[in-house]
Each structure stands twice: as structure tokens, then as C-alpha cells.
């Protein structure tokens, strides 16, 4: 399945690639190393994180094949062109940037690629620490990754919908966000940001490490109604979001 790939190893990182994508190996490795160091410190890991294996695949067909057969993640085939990365345990399948123009909706950007790898590394770390990752709400997992990777600061897909919602006084309810994958990416990070701003990083770590049933609000000690009202008020007055507009 992956026998035909070339491999680059450095410390606890292993990157698979084909020859035409060799030019992306170093930046992939460096970004993974930086992400592991940064977020191991954030999540207060007491021991070294296990080795991570990333595979740069050359096209959409190979991406779908490895996601299904190697990672055992059931996705639509052919997958949506907005899918360019899929983590599972300590493996990460990445559509190589050389295939973006033909097989994705994205244009390659060095900075956005680094933030993407940070985003996916957060998913890997969350799965490693979580008592039951399958129960984790999508808004929480994606919100955590968008927030800590700082994609929300620089990428319009995550920031603009929130700015528009604030300005038009149409911020969705959390139940609505949970039911809509798109809203999970757009608004999940604002909920995580509010939690960290209000309750501190210790609460983020508590949720990641102890939320086994998916009830984030039980861990916080708030009803969803009370929490939602305070979060929406926070958004209306959160200047930092506008500072990056």
C-alpha cells in the first residue's frame, strides 16, 4: 500500500513521499516538529509524544485510497475537494501541495500549509489524550484545532463568517452549530476561545483529558443555556476578533 513511497526520517517524524514532492518534505517535517513541541507544552505532556508518520500523497485517488485502507476512515469516494488532510492515531495523510491546483479547492501557501499541519497535529494530540475521542463534539475538536493553530487570525474561511454574524446580530445557537459541519469550523473556535479566556487553559486541558461522554458543559459546570448566553455576549464585545479583520 505504501511500499512504493520514499521515506524521510528525523527524530520522531517519518514522512512518506514520491520524488516529485520531495521539495515539500522539509517544511512538512519542520512544521510537525514545531507543532509537537508547542502543543506538547500546551497540553502539559509528561512524556515524549509517540512518533508521527505523515504521507504526502500525489493525487485525490491516492488520498482516498490511503484514508480508507490505511487509516480505516470511511469517507465518500471521490472525496470532497476541500479534504486535504486526515489524521488517525499517529498517522497523517496529506494531499501534497503539488496536487492542490487539480485536486482541491485550495491554492498552496507556505504559511497556510504550516497552519494546516498545526491544525492536524492538534487533532492527533487530542485523540492521544482523550478518554473517548469518538464522543467529542465536532465543534469542540475543530474549534480547538482552529483556535490553537491560529487559523482564525489569518484565514477568511474561519473569521469572516463570525464577523458577519456579530455585525448582523445573527450568531447561531450551539445546538445549531453542532448539527452543521460548516458552522463547527466557523464558530467552534470562538467557543474554545471563550472557554480559555473565561476559565483558563486548565479548563481546556480538563475537557480534553476528562470529557468521556461529550458533555463539555458538564465539565465546565454550566448549563448550555447559561453558557450560550455568556458566550454570545462575549463575542459581541471581543475586540481581538475585529483586530485581525
Predicted features by range, described:
Residues 84, 112-116, 128-245:
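Acidic/His/Gly-enriched intrinsically disordered linker/tail segments
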Residues 2-130, 215:
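Juxtacatalytic substrate-recognition/specificity segment
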